[in-house]
């Protein structure tokens, strides 16, 4: 009892099968996912999840927030999100009203590009994940290893992740996604612009990296073998 060991989550075989089934490896050509690419947040709509920061960041990136034109980094390949880019928000929670007010205050174009989709589960949710261009983990508290991130990688959807808690362990910069400073809407906005500039070829490589991450770290058998190895090393000491 002299040691405490924390290991990351693993995905069950059924979750892996679901991820493979909903993975969309032709998003750029897909009639819906290609013509209207979207960022996806799925989870509880609460302050600690950074949902208001995310909405503000999207408004800035899309040029729909006051002063947003001056907020972007000069080295971005894309200065403003093309108007075909959307933000999908799946879930419910105490900040829904504040989100609706924020969207309404930004005008009708914001309302047309930010979709509050409510609660989803099962394959309905997973298809939303699989068709998203990027998911966003905007948490502002220290999560160990958010399951939503693992589900996203299993569906070969790269992540925009806050640099807090265990989230950076999921995101290899430019490979499985991009990171930003937690709580910083401008930094998140700039990450969104990076995403919009990713070519089809580079995106395909990112999807491959997502699949490789899950295969190397999150399969049940791999997890069990790593756990057995860890126990054996602890016992030997």
Which residues does each PLM region occupy?
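Conserved acidic donor-binding segment of nucleotide-sugar-dependent glycosyltransferases
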Residues: 173-174, 178-185, 194-200
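Short alpha-helical donor nucleotide-sugar binding micro-motif in glycosyltransferases
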Residues: 119-120, 127-132
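A short, well-ordered alpha-helix in the C-terminal region of glycosyltransferases
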Residues: 201-217, 223-226
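Acidic donor-binding loop of glycosyltransferase active sites
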Residues: 130-144, 157
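Short alpha-helical segment that forms part of, or immediately flanks, the ligand-binding pocket
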Residues: 126, 144, 149-154, 168-169, ...
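Nucleotide-activated donor-binding/catalytic signature segment of Leloir-type glycosyltransferases, i.e.
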Residues: 77, 98-120
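Conserved donor-binding/catalytic core segment of Leloir-type glycosyltransferases
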Residues: 29-49, 53-59, 88
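Carbohydrate-associated surface elements
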Residues: 10
